[in-house]
Each structure stands twice: as C-alpha cells, then as structure tokens.
C-alpha cells in the first residue's frame, strides 16, 4: 500500500519541475497518478480487510478475491493501466539535463506501453479461467517482469531528486 503514495510523490516532484510548455502533460500525469492511487488503494484495502478476514461465499469470492480474477482484479489492472498512462505523460513533461534523467524519461515513456494491455485485456475475458482456480503462473511472471522494469525507475527517480537537491543547495 506504500507504492501508490510513493508514486504520487515522484509524479508530484516531476510535475513541479516541468516547464510551462509541458504543464499539460505534467498535469495529466499527476491526475492519472491520483486515479491509480485511488483504484489500487481500494483494491489492496479490500484484500487486506474483507477478503482476508471474512469467510466469503463463492459469488462474493469471485468478485472480491483478487486471486480469482474478478472485479477487484480488473480494478487493480485498471489502476496499473492508469499508472502506465501517468508515467507516459510524466515522461513527456521531463526535460532531461543528464544521462540519468534521459534514462528516467525513456523508461517512464516506455512504461506507458503497459496501458493498453492493462485496460483492454480484462475486457477480452482472458482472466476468466482464474475464477475457477485454473490460473497458472502467468500473473506471477508478469508481476516479476513488471518489477524488474519498474525498479530502475525508482532508482533513477531517487538519483534525479538527490542530484536536484544537491544542485539547489549550493
């Protein structure tokens, strides 16, 4: 539940640094970061409260249990789709001044590629097998690949803000 808050802080910092000529992209990125946070926090809160602590009947479990690929799972994918769209716009708003910033901008824009999959795949019924407990390891593999992609974004953002702070404190 900490990732959405941390991501909003990163998006807000990059929004603050964006130039006037790129504020529309930065604004879109920041608003979409908020949409992402709301969706994902609702999903995680439901999972850690209702799903974990209550005995759910089969119908409720199909809707609320993330592992069964129902409504809550689809909301989670929608949330991460909004994050992908947010990173795309935040990346467009950046004016890189060094290699670290160039890589951060590239990764943020490339991360936007995840949006169509997160948005449209649930509409295809691709995850309906999960409802019957027939899911394989595809979701776990996808999550691990996403983590391998997004960890460098966090590291580069940390370096970006650390360098920004050092340059302004002179």
Question: Regions from the language model: what does each represent?
Answer:
Residues 1-170:
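Hydrophobic, aromatic-enriched alpha-helical segments typical of multi-pass transmembrane helices
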């Amino acid at each position: 539940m900490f990732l959405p808050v941390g991501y909003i802080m990163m998006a807000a910092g990059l929004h603050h640094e964006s130039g006037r000529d790129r504020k529309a992209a930065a604004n879109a990125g920041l608003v979409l970061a908020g949409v992402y946070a709301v969706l994902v926090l609702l999903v995680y809160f439901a999972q850690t409260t209702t799903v974990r602590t209550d005995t759910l009947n089969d119908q409720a479990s199909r809707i609320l249990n993330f592992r069964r690929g129902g409504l809550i799972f689809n909301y989670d994918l929608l949330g991460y789709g909004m994050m992908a769209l947010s990173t795309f716009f935040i990346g467009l708003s950046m004016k890189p001044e060094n290699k670290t910033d160039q890589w951060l901008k590239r990764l943020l824009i490339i991360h936007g590629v995840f949006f169509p999959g997160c948005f449209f795949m649930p509409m295809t019924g691709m995850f309906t097998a999960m409802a019957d407990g027939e899911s394989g390891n595809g979701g776990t593999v996808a999550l691990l690949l996403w983590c391998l992609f997004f960890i460098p974004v966090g590291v580069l953002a940390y370096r970006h803000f650390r360098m920004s702070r050092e340059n302004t404190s002179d």
